[in-house]
Every structure is written in C-alpha cells, then in structure tokens.
Amino acid sequence: MCIRDSSKDLCMIEHIPELVDAGIDSFKIEGRMKTALYVATVARTYRKAIDDYLKDPVLYEKNMPWYLDQISNCTYRQFTTGFFYGKPDSEAQIYDSNTYVKEYTYLGIVGGSNAEGLYRIEQRNKFSVGETIEIMKPNGDNIKAKVLRIVNEEGGEQESAPHPKQVLYIDLGVPMEQYDILRRKEDA
C-alpha cells in the first residue's frame, strides 16, 4: 500500500478578487518537477481569470467553471488555499493513498516548422499516426486534430513516436505555432 504525507496543490483561481484587492500583481507556480503542460495550463488559466476579472467581475464569475475545468485537467493532486486564510488544518495534507490525478498526457511542445510545412516537436510521451490529440494554444481555444504524419530527423516516416525527447516533424492538418503544447485526453 502506498501512503502519502504531502501537501495538496495550492489553487487560488476562485479567489482572484481577493488577490487583486490585496495588491498582488505577480504569481509564481510552485513545485519542482512540474511538466511544461502543467505550467502552460496553469499560467494560461490564471492569466485569463485575472484579465476577465479586471475587465468585468461578472465575466470572471461566469467563466469560473472553465477555469476550474482547465486547472483540473492538468496533472494535479487535491487543492488547498494554503496559508491565505490562516494556518491550514489537517485537510491541507494528504495522508491516505495516492490521490494523484492525470486527465491529460503531455505529448510535446511545438518548436517551429520546416520548409515542407511539418511542425518540429520535442516529443515527451508516445503517440501514433491516426490518433486524435489536442493543441493547447498559449492564447485562444484548444484545437483537436488527428496525427496525419510523423517524420524523424533523418526524413524517415514513423507510425508512432515512442521515444521521449525525440525530435520529430508532424502534420496535424491544422496550423500550429511555436510553443503550442500537444496533449492527449486519457480515458477515465
């Protein structure tokens, strides 16, 4: 049996008004060993929540389900508000079995394109031709697309991308930009 004794992840997305009213104008993502997918998802979601709140507090409240969904969809443990509202109680710790949740798998990050119109990625987890994946944009809506082609650095076609950190060129049939994140939703 795996027993954990660790803190829950800090999540203040529902408390943006209090943070802004307190004069906080900079946020830091805590934790070592967070993936680029986690950092990109959290940074994009907080940026949108703050912008929405400053534009119109009603818009911020209206979009709360979207913010919570985005934060919950990246790799996370349970959430806490930490020390913001006083000393945390025992509920801020995880004492039982592993509650680690992973709804999306980080597949890679786009690093540009080549003369053929294929997009260069540094792959992180396996994916295959024919699979539907999601492109997470730094700004804007996510896009679902099918992997049409995978080409290695030597120009050889591949049916799958099984080697972490391998540099590949892919075609998803839709335009991508540098720093787009590729991810796959996992079955529950």
Which role does the model predict for each range below?
Residues R4-A188:
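Surface-exposed amphipathic alpha-helical tracts and adjacent flexible/coil segments at the periphery
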